[in-house]
Amino acid sequence: MAPKAGKTKPHKSKGEKKKKEEKVLPTVIEISVETPDESQVTLKGISTDRILDVRKLLAVHVQTCHFTNFSLSHQVRGTKLKDSVDIVSLKPCHLTIVEEDYTEEQATAHIRRLLDIVACTTAFGPSKPPVSRTLPKDSEKKESGSTDGDSPTEKDAGDSNSGLSPKPKESEKKSVGACEAQSAEGAAKSDIDMCPPTRLGQFYEFFSFSYLTPPIQYIRRSVRPSKEDKGLDDLFQIDIKVSSGKPFTVVASRTGFYPPGKQQLLCHSLVELLQQISRPFDAAYDALMKAFIEHNKFGNLPYGFRANTWVVPPVVADSPSTFPSLPVEDETWGGDGGGVGRSGKYDKRKWAKEFAILAAMPCKTPEERQVRDRKAFLLHSLFVDVSVFKAVEIIKKIVENNQCSLKDPAALGFHEERIGDLIVRVARDDPDASAKLDRKSDGTQVLEISQEELAQRNLLKGITADESATVHDTSTLGVVVVRHCGCTAIVKVASEFKLNDGHILQDIDIEDQSEGGANALNVNSLRTLLHKSSTPSSLAQRSPNADSEQIRVAKSLVRKVIEDSLKKLEIEPSRYSKPIRWELGACWVQHLQNQASSKSESKKTEDPKPEPAVKGLGKQGALLKEIKRKIDVKANKTEQGKEAPANDTDNTSETEDQKELEKQNEEIEKMWKELVTETAYQRLKESETGFHLKSPKELIEMARKYYTDTALPKLVADFGSLELSPVDGRTLTDFMHTRGLQMHSLGRVVELAEKLPHVQSLCVHEMIVRAYKHILQAVVAAVENTADVATSIATCLNVLLGTPSDTESVYDEKIKWTWVETFISKRFGWDWKHEGCQELRKFSILRGLSHKVGLELVPKDYEMDTSYPFKKFDIISMVPVYKHVACSSADGRTLLESSKTSLDKGKLEDAVNYGTKALAKLVAVCGPYHRMTAGAYSLLAVVLYHTGDFNQATIYQQKALDINERELGLDHPDTMKSYGDLAVFYYRLQHTELALKYVNRALYLLHLTCGPSHPNTAATYINVAMMEEGMKNAHVALRYLHEALKCNQRLLGADHIQTAASYHAIAIALSLMDAYSLSVQHEQTTLQILQAKLGPEDLRTQDAAAWLEYFESKALEQQEAARNGTPKPDASISSKGHLSVSDLLDYITPDSGIKARDAQRKARPKVKGKPGQSPGPVSEENQKDDEILSPAHLTGESSSDKENKSETKSEEKKVENFDLEQSKPQDQLKLVKPEATVHEDDDSDEGWQEAVPKNRFSSGRRTRPSLAKLNTNFMNVTQQPSRSRGKSTNFTSPRTSSNELSISVAGSTSSPASKMFVKSPLNKKQNNSSVVGERPVNDKSALASSACTEQINKPTPMLSPVSVKAGKLFSYKEVALAPPGTIVKIVAEQLPEETKAPQNLDAAKIAVDGPEKVNAQDAESENKHVATETEAENTDCNEQGRVVVGGSELTSSPKEIKNVEVEKAAEKAFPIETAVSNARPGKSKSAQMAEDSDTCLLNKSPTANDSNGSESVIGVKLQKDLCDAELKTVDGETENLPNGDSSPKSSVAADGEKQDACEAQKEMSKKLSASAPPYTPTTIPIFGSIAVPGFKDHGGILPSPLNMPPMLPINHVRRSTPHQSVTARVPYGPRLSGGGYNRSGNRVPRNKPSFPNSTESNGEANQFNGPRIMNPHAAEFIPSQPWVSNGYPVSPNGYLASPNGAEITQNGYPLSPVAGGYPCNMSVTQPQDGLVSEELPGAGSSEEKSGSEEESNNDKNAGEDDEAVGQETTDTPENGHSTVGEVETTSHETCDEKNGERQGGKCWGDYSDNEIEQIEVTS
């Protein structure tokens, strides 16, 4: 363990530190490479890359992947650049490939590469051709078909549940089945039958291209003598048969390849030659390259694989006796299984001496340790490889020679060999499964000491550990334990070497790694095949009797082993002495130090007593304070002096005791110095734990107490919070071992995890796997003839995993379970009965067994429901399993943990700095392509993702995935995590189809490992949902969301934050279907959970409140539409109040139609009021999209009906009568007093992401995520727009403090309310005399405005003012099945009545108990906003049917509801309208239209100071004035508002101009990005991540990047491209007011080069016809497990914790609540016709600017802190919102913009990212 950082380091000034760290920030670099054929390839690299990395990038690029033997030259640096050259030093970054001559070895390697590239067409079994997922139907069928993805239901149905909750499992199947029946119709049946875990046969389908014609059938060395004389440069000849079946002979020479006798055709590359001489090869190879690009155009090509997974490649199943190697490992062409030391040249190495020199090397500074660690890593890796080779070699000899016959008792003894310094001891395993042998690398047998001595040794090592603990412990460093084929070998260095002074000066001479650490030893390559070669005829001749006899013998052997072992186990005494792992001591010290530091911090905060502040004293005041302090100190001393004499007698006895104590301490100190080194003792004293005053025995007892009372409960608590999220036994073991916990405590973990069924399930499965492992190992050890091993293993697996069908099988089943129960009881101290766990995840158990015992199986769909699922030939081989100490860089791991901790706290700049340093450290120690480094790449990718730099994140994660696949295995948890994370990154880069491939692969592996009932799986469901929604499959997305909800409810509880996140995601999904009343119900549950768990002050709670308010307003809009006479949809669902998941699913069943209609008739409430416009559901969709996506970090849960009911009850208590069922006449409003409102915070620990970070982007624009470099320089938030490649640059998501005003901007909603506003511009139609731009205000806009004003007036903790009673909706069934956007939901509207609640605009604070006040404020703001809009309309348009709705008085009790007095409201509304209209005398019609569309924007952002943003400024000002006036005059009372305006009480005026949905649609298509259809500012909250690691380790989700603009404006116009909505996604959901992602956290602006995505760049209006889609930027799930790959836990929290949002901008200014104007310097392309392509909702012309200076000044009051942001954002149209090619400018917009009213300048209220829409694909 590393010592506490910073103790010995001098303090640096903050500025100094920042400067230094800024230098290490990585950036994306484009590397241009010229190929030999003079074409150019552009690679995307990172500034930390070297020439070695460029070679790797070339190897995974389709144009250059077949090049192997070349050097790289640079016009300045010269030729043959070394692999270590940094690419940042190459100016310009343009390289040239120079072909080099071949040696025979290199020519062989070149052929191996070609075979490797084409292997995917033959080696990985059957595959399906890719299917385009553009149409809903196709995607529906493809849901489970895209590579490996399956619907959650499939997995649920097929994979057995945890066994601990079989009942939920059944209901789950049933409800999901119902859902499938409706949404997938005919496909549902097959979906349910297809269960991923049972489809092991599809394991390799993800990599298989067998649907293509193999370009090459074979390549062989030619055995024919060449006809011509062999040339001097010729190396050898090969025979090639290409795809057409035509054979060719090719000569390999030093200069290249050519057909014999045709040297004029000489080509340096074999591919080029074959393309010239064979058209069929050319066509087949070209088709393969195209398939590679379709698979993943950014890299991660499916070759370079090694057979390193327990499931062998399908090609092996055809010839198990020969095991055809994959090309990389094919010895015929120079391949091998990796590693070093095969040749035996290291047999005589002086290991003892070199380990001793390592331990003596200087290691005081990080630099010294890095040098030492590099040598230690290389030496130890070499030692491990040599040891494994030697051990396996000796074991194979023993097994083949049958030297260890079981009939000879002596044979069970040791077989020992000595090889140089190495001693290899091999022993046959005991066929007794109950035998417990300690064969750990640091166990009693290896170290040859007793248990007590071992416990003391490990504890002392742990409590004195530092960065060098591993290297200094040479006795364990030099040990490897290998188990293989029923034997165990212990390899250790002969003896410790005593160094003298001369040796200390020596250095270790060791070779560097080849290929940067890639191609490490694949232990599977050392397999022992279990089938001897035999001809097919001999197999056919075998009689069935022989096979059945063999099976009978094997079965009796298995039965005998179990029976004998069970007898011995039952009489085995319980073990009393428990060992101690050294990690426990290290964690214990850290725990105590953390406690001490927290106490000291609390004391610091408590000690200083607040002194009364006396202002105006200046320096004299400070002087007086100092004098007073001195007097106090003197007085204190004199008092002590007076007391002293009285205590003299006591002092004498005390001194005697003191002497005695000192004597004891001296004795203990002497003893300690004998036990540990002097430096270790000093470390122990400095640790301030007091351990140096205790004896070892006392410490052991204390450590055991810490273990039981603290360590175990803390582990379970971290499981519950999802800070740790193990997905299988391996990750569970790693987490426990890293904390020093023993696996024998699994029983205790199960007891403590009573409320965590997924953790209990993992523990139970791991205990069962271990019980099975002992049986299987004993059976293998008991087999006398190696030829019978395969049969015995298959028979044993049948007994353990099969389903009994006959009497004999039933008996075997009985004794098997008796063994398991007894084993668990004896070894784990837990009483378990298998009857309570009917359904086990048998494939998970099979996988665990294969890992632990070392089995390789054929990939096929094993029928576990039969008695004999396994056959002899299914068991291919046994592979060695070995253990050793891990040796890497402790400093690197510490930096990784620091990075993760910073990420958790939202300190993105620090997280990037630490992550970059950690990566550099691990690259220096382990090499860039070693499995240890992959964890650093992965973590840094997640950190960069949170900063919004998706390009860089993707590049790093691709590197990690490539390493994990090739070095760790295709189903390793780290590999799984990389698939999931990469899917999220691709999604954020708007490559939805590609993202779906990878997320489905991750989901397939999750089902295989942890099953469907796991938080990581639920989190992945949410990611799949958002991607499915992006592919226009809204109903499929809903099914995944329901699955996630049920899963989270079942696993984490109905009141867990993750469950709330699932409710929230579903609420957004429903809103996309216009089912707002259902959204309200689900969001109410979200809010209640968050209020109870986090409190009303938490940002997530506030966000949820904002969303609820938004949904309520939308539901009211629907009610208004209903009054207009639009067809009344089915209200059956909404009338039921909050529905449980199963109830919702019931609505999807076919027979529910009648019930739904009945319910509809009953539930239809009567509504008073005049018809208003029917709003378009545009922004909501986005909202949903984003939100669904955002759950990325969440793991969704779902709850049963009962849970829902109980939840609803509690909700009703907290939020009075949220249940819509209790609705009274709809014309009455029920004001509900929610306790507090919550929203998901992107950075939250629970995986919540900010719903709507401060920035919102302008409504209409459909923008792409801005991918910019991370700029940590706080001096300038804005970065120069990078126009070079049209890259979008930095998005800063501003954050605001809770006291700042939260103002929503039009179109870019900072809160859900703002979304409502967005709608107002929606109806801007030019062809209508009542200009749609000024669109008559309808209730929707009124609500929006009210929300906006509300935000202005309200303090951060917003209370949801209205509980909407929505009554008239389509049935859930109709909603779920209807294509997105086809159903217009209409809900009878209830207008809220509100009481007066004067508030200070600047920092009004609302008490939690004062919701009524908040409600009143909301109403007032609503009125103001509406008034503004109506006024504008009056000025330039004909007024049509305005509906004025006034809020009648509300009593203080939120429960009381009064009728809305429409008439009174109308009377009072007009005066205000007139006043407002007069306020804007000089505005042109178009300007006013723009303003109206922006009225919503009023809240937009306080950055009104922008010179170009006068328009929005005016709007804000007007709205503020209105709000003020209203607030002041509510109920006739006038209060001073910040603006000082007061006016008679007015009511909300809602313009009732009726507008058809189709009109709105037309309008939408006309909009340009900036003023585009009032894009309801929907930002989707992204949920904090996980376990991506998402899995922290592997399970988790990525929260949306902190730095991403919270809202990407979405153009609601439909787009034809398949990923339309993806580009328009908004990263976060609406947010009421300040608050950072988590609690703190700086949003770091990054200039990120855009990732290639050319398909959606053009901006034709007709392109926007696609259905709405979820926010692509929504946070995705990255399962949140904390460990770094390779079992090095980065931190208990996992990598992916969402960052905490700090409220400081990049330039150090506090973020404005509405700082929408974050400059996003995206280079913007101006439309060629010279028109700004879209109106910017707040951008004003120079004309307006002069007219509204006063107002902009006033606006500064509203948000001064936005000033900095605003100034930058308002600069030029380049920074502005002027749209690139998003949408063609319509004539209407042209008119609006003619007057210059809306130039492209960016205004502070504009949240558009300035992103350039066109992104070129460069890779």
Curated annotation (Swiss-Prot):
Disruption phenotype: No visible phenotype. Reduced proportion of the cellular volume devoted to chloroplasts leading to an abnormal chloroplasts distributions. Lower levels of chlorophyll, especially in plants lacking REC1, REC2, REC3 and FMT/CLU. The modification Phosphoserine is found at S1244, S1320. Residues 1269-1313, 1343-1354, 1496-1511, 1536-1546, 1650-1665, 1767-1778 have a biased composition (Polar residues). Keywords: Cell cycle, Coiled coil, Cytoplasm, Developmental protein, Nucleus, Phosphoprotein, Repeat, TPR repeat. Residues 329-603 form the Clu domain. TPR repeats lie at residues 892-925, 934-967, 976-1009, 1018-1051, 1060-1093. One of its GO terms (molecular function) is mRNA binding. The keyword Secreted does not apply. Residues 135-145, 600-612, 1199-1224, 1230-1239, 1551-1566, 1742-1759, 1785-1800 have a biased composition (Basic and acidic residues). It is found in: Nucleus; Cytoplasm, Cytosol. Residues 1-17 have a biased composition (Basic residues). One of its GO terms (cellular component) is plasma membrane. Expressed in the non-epidermal tissues of the true leaves. Not detected in the vegetative shoot meristem and leaf primordia. Residues 1-23, 128-180, 595-619, 634-664, 1152-1360, 1413-1456, 1468-1513, 1527-1573, 1616-1670, 1731-1809 are annotated as: Disordered. The keyword Cell cycle applies. The sucrose repression of TSS is a response specific to the rescue of stip mutants, and the presence of STIP in the wild-type may be sufficient to repress TSS expression even under sugar deprivation. Negatively regulates meristematic tissue proliferation by integrating developmental signals with carbon source availability. May act as the scaffold of a protein complex, which sequesters key factors that are required for the G2 to M transition in meristematic tissues. Together with REC2, REC3 and FMT/CLU, contributes to the establishment of the cellular volume devoted to the chloroplast compartment. This is Protein REDUCED CHLOROPLAST COVERAGE 2. It comes from Arabidopsis thaliana. The gene is REC2.
